[in-house]
Amino acid sequence: MRCVVQRVREASVTIGGERFSSIGAGLLVLAGISREDTEADLAWMSRKLPNLRIFEDDEGRMNRSVKEIGGELLVVSQFTLYADASRGNRPGFTESAPSEVAQPLFDRFVELLRRESGLPVETGSFGADMQVSLINDGPVTIILESPKK
């Protein structure tokens, strides 16, 4: 599982011109599911994200987690995180899990993240054409990948 994590002041998802979901301060998580991902990958990521210390403490150091600041999470499924553009100019997506596999894993990941964090967790709409807006705070952007098996 691969996630691009952005510390945000706010973020939202719009679908078909209508606001679908939004958060205030917290994390925008673009989540990619690979063909090889299992429940263990989802569990690892759902434990890591709420405890990732990328928010500043009183001394200006990245020392606080989204849990500690009482923030929110917006999780958006993004199969393109497993794009392979090493040959040619058109990326291939053979590493990404097919949607019939990825959607239940994504839904399970969100469920685990809600339980693990105890925080509000909003989502995009799996497979939809979405416009994602954000105000990046910092900016702070981190790529996380579940451990290789």
UniProtKB/Swiss-Prot annotation:
It is found in: Cytoplasm. It catalyses: glycyl-tRNA(Ala) + H2O = tRNA(Ala) + glycine + H(+); a D-aminoacyl-tRNA + H2O = a tRNA + a D-alpha-amino acid + H(+). Pfam families: Tyr_Deacylase (PF02580). One of its GO terms (biological process) is D-amino acid catabolic process. GO terms for cellular component: cytoplasm. A motif (Gly-cisPro motif, important for rejection of L-amino acids) lies at residues 138-139. It comes from the Bacteria. Coiled coil: none annotated. Keywords: Cytoplasm, Hydrolase, RNA-binding, tRNA-binding. Its main location: cytoplasm. Belongs to the DTD family. Homodimer. A Gly-cisPro motif from one monomer fits into the active site of the other monomer to allow specific chiral rejection of L-amino acids. An aminoacyl-tRNA editing enzyme that deacylates mischarged D-aminoacyl-tRNAs. Also deacylates mischarged glycyl-tRNA(Ala), protecting cells against glycine mischarging by AlaRS. Acts via tRNA-based rather than protein-based catalysis; rejects L-amino acids rather than detecting D-amino acids in the active site. By recycling D-aminoacyl-tRNA to D-amino acids and free tRNA molecules, this enzyme counteracts the toxicity associated with the formation of D-aminoacyl-tRNA entities in vivo and helps enforce protein L-homochirality. NCBIfam families: D-aminoacyl-tRNA deacylase (TIGR00256). This is D-aminoacyl-tRNA deacylase. It comes from Chlorobaculum parvum (strain DSM 263 / NCIMB 8327). The gene is dtd.
